[in-house]
Swiss-Prot record:
Pathway: Cofactor biosynthesis; adenosylcobalamin biosynthesis. Catalyzes amidations at positions B, D, E, and G on adenosylcobyrinic A,C-diamide. NH(2) groups are provided by glutamine, and one molecule of ATP is hydrogenolyzed for each amidation. Keywords: Cobalamin biosynthesis, Glutamine amidotransferase. Belongs to the CobB/CobQ family. CobQ subfamily. SUPFAM superfamilies: Class I glutamine amidotransferase-like, P-loop containing nucleoside triphosphate hydrolases. Transmembrane segments: none annotated. It comes from Salmonella typhimurium (strain LT2 / SGSC1412 / ATCC 700720). It comes from the Bacteria. GO terms for biological process: cobalamin biosynthetic process. This is Cobyric acid synthase.
């Protein structure tokens, strides 16, 4: 008999994903086979499973916390916004279609049966399922077709714990208002509340906790302090809140251009964890100063973001910085933008558009999306700041719709191993000042990251930093720190009791 618990929130970015990862880690530490599950995820941060399926990064890092391999069943529906009104719909790891919000709302009832079948399939293989909702269950305009909050809790017949963020203020109003807007049968599913991101003396909350418990009849299971742990974020809310300001002084400063449709900014978590690196996300041209490397990240709408670069003045700022001798790197969509030409006869209908011209490449968009995990080897000879990375093994994943062809003056950056064949990827100029690749997750390869950071150090006349830093070990420590804090501040025994009292056969 499988046990389950679902975390829902009073709003987006209250910490559901991180707390769900913490529960996965706790149950894993306690010897239970545990899997995460989120029926529908809207995010531009995605990853690839070993069998080439695309899913949300949040469920990938939750699976890592649970000590298991990510499985697309943990996130059967992924929505990737392509504009303010449209999103790409990814079902069971493969692109299905593009839809606007109204069309998707009408489409959702058809997904219920498939989602339930996937959930039941997953539940048969694990002792515990930790479910995560999206946004808030009190979105009363979406209630009738809900498949991700109370609608999913009903399908799974599981109890709900409500997570509220005190850091943004109004936590008791958020708790009370959320519960008040639920139907009685939905409120009855809520068995506890966790107050998250508290700073200060928790004794100041005691009277408020007593009152909210009296008003709602729902116990507060704990108050989680604001934690200084390095864990992935599900979407761009953290960027909007300047979580990654990176004010601490470090030897190396890397600027990442914060594109309107930025995707997979989790590419840079391992880079930010380096002890001598400061990451800055840049939105304005005047902020692009005193940097050692500029990175154009992935994008869900390459041509729209390329137009924004030009309209905002960021394109001129990037080109000026490059002329001053600062290397510029592009990943996936950013790689496409660095080229001479982008040909789109598939998505936008814009035809041929000029890129930034730092790489002599031509990119043609395609109908089919490439989604695969790959092992690769950096080219045997690389120039400039990349020289120390020559010949190093790296690992990552591809998520792109298009092919980039190198022209005169560009060299292949690396060789991928795909289906038993060697495939060229990426481009680098003779001076090394422009470098692009389709490979996401590149900086998770410790030796590569240290080599290129030391290459940047050498450009500044700094000695190389020899370190045994391992990003995989770093992530494991963060999961353990999170679990330890949750055991200290949340009544985990009560959560076990809640699950046992609502245990359902699968």
């Amino acid at each position: 008999m499988t046990q389950a618990v679902m975390l829902q929130g009073t709003a987006s970015d209250v910490g559901k994903s991180v707390l769900a990862a913490g529960l996965c880690r706790i149950f894993y530490q306690d010897g239970l086979r545990t899997a995460p599950f989120k029926s529908q995820n809207m995010a531009l941060n995605s990853g690839i499973t070993p069998d080439g399926k695309e899913m949300g990064r949040a469920q990938i890092f939750q699976a890592e916390a649970a000590g298991i391999t990510p499985d697309v069943r943990m996130n059967p529906v992924l929505l990737k916004p392509t504009s303010d009104r449209q999103a790409q719909v990814v079902l069971m790891g493969k692109v299905a279609t593009n839809m606007d919000a109204v069309s998707y709302h009408d489409y959702k009832p058809r997904l219920r049966e498939q989602i339930l079948a996937v959930y039941n399939s997953l539940a048969q293989e694990y002792d515990v399922i930790v479910l995560e909702g999206a946004g808030s269950p009190a979105e009363i305009n979406l209630r009738d077709r809900d498949i991700v909050n109370m609608g999913m809790a009903e399908m799974a017949q599981c109890p709900v714990i409500l997570v509220a963020d005190i850091d943004r203020g109004g936590v008791f109003a958020a708790i009370y208002g959320t519960l008040a807007l639920l139907h009685k049968q939905e409120r009855d599913r809520v068995k506890g509340v966790i107050i998250n991101k508290f700073r200060g003396d928790v004794a100041l909350l005691y009277s408020g906790i007593e009152q909210i418990e009296s008003l709602t009849g729902v116990p507060v299971l704990g108050v989680m302090p604001w934690l200084d742990v390095d864990l992935e974020d599900e979407d761009g809310v953290a960027l909007q809140n300047d979580k990654y300001r990176g004010n601490a002084p470090r030897d190396i400063t890397i600027a990442i251009v914060q594109l309107p449709h930025i995707s997979n900014f989790t590419d840079f978590n391992a880079l930010a964890a380096q002890p001598d690196v400061r990451i800055r996300y840049i939105r304005r041209p005047e902020a692009l100063t005193d940097v050692d490397l500029v990175i154009l990240p992935g994008s869900k709408n390459t041509l729209s973001d390329l137009a924004w670069l030009r309209e905002s003045g960021m394109a001129d700022a990037v080109l000026q910085t490059h002329r001053q001798g600062v290397p510029v790197m592009g990943i996936c969509g950013g790689y496409q933008m660095l080229g001479d030409t982008i040909v789109d006869e598939v998505e936008s209908g814009l035809g041929t558009q000029p890129g930034l011209g730092l790489l002599n490449t031509i990119t043609r968009f395609a109908q089919d999306k490439t989604t695969t995990q790959v092992n690769a080897t950096m080219s045997g000879e690389l120039p400039g700041w990349l020289a120390a990375a020559a010949g190093l093994p790296v690992r990552g994943y591809e998520i792109h719709m298009g092919e980039t062809v190198l022209q005169e003056g560009c060299c292949t950056a690396m060789t991928l191993q795909k289906n038993g064949c060697s495939v060229a990827d990426g481009a680098v100029t003779a001076d090394g000042l422009a470098f692009g690749t389709y490979l996401h997750g590149l900086f998770d390869s410790d030796a590569f990251t240290r080599a290129v950071v030391n290459g940047l150090r050498a450009r500044k006349g700094l000695a190389p930093w020899e370190t045994t830093f391992c990003y995989a070990d770093h992530k494991a420590r963060q999961f353990d720190l999170l679990a330890e804090a949750m055991r200290q501040h949340i009544d985990i025994d009560k959560i076990y009791t809640i699950m046992q009292q609502h245990q359902e056969p699968v």
